[in-house]
Amino acid sequence: MDNIIRFIDEKGNLLPLEEVQKSVEAVYEDFSREQCGCEKYDNPLVESTSILSSLTNPDNSIDIEEVTNKLAFLDRTLYLTDVIQPESAISYADMIKFWNIVDDIDEIPVEEREPIKIYIDSPGGDLDATFSIIDAIALSKTPVWTVTIGRGFSGAFFIGIAGHKRFGFPHSTYLFHEGCAENGGDAHKFIQGVKFYETRLEMLKEHTLKHTKITEEKYKKHKKDDLWMTAEDAIKYGVIDEILTEIL
């Protein structure tokens, strides 16, 4: 606080009442800014009481990434932007479960619940982890919207089509295929593993035919190779419901 209240001038004479009042107002304004931690800066774009002012205030020790993550979570927004792993699948299931519990406690009717949004930009990943996230979405009473903002490849493709509503960015891309698997052990265990994997692939097929307009004939044609799609193609095949023209 740089200002002080002055009653006399440099010669020792009493200052006019108007000047004393201005001095009091300046001190009060300084004190008020210090209390809220929002001093004005030279940049006129940053208002003293704005959130940006608080975040950029050098006196505040704020981890921007941590703040962003917390705000996203409070906004019911999740990001699937890496390889899909079992650990991350548990995290997504927990967050979906959390908001269902909140809505249940608040007794909010399903049709009035604020949706959980999953933003997707992923190359895919573990098949079991993929199914875990798909099941969490399917079992959620609170609506879960999927928004493919970049890559909806492999496992991320199957998660994307699971949303109660499915959206895509204008330049989002999609890759449908059944992926690959590794198996080891002796011959008997190898055969068992192959049979079980075939069962999982059949589940992927049922999931795809249920949630898209991809026909069984087209599925069989592309399941062992790659079917690439633009956002427009994704609309055509019922992979997404809408191409976004603004951020949700």
Where is each model-derived feature located?
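Terminal-region recognition feature
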Residues: M1-L248
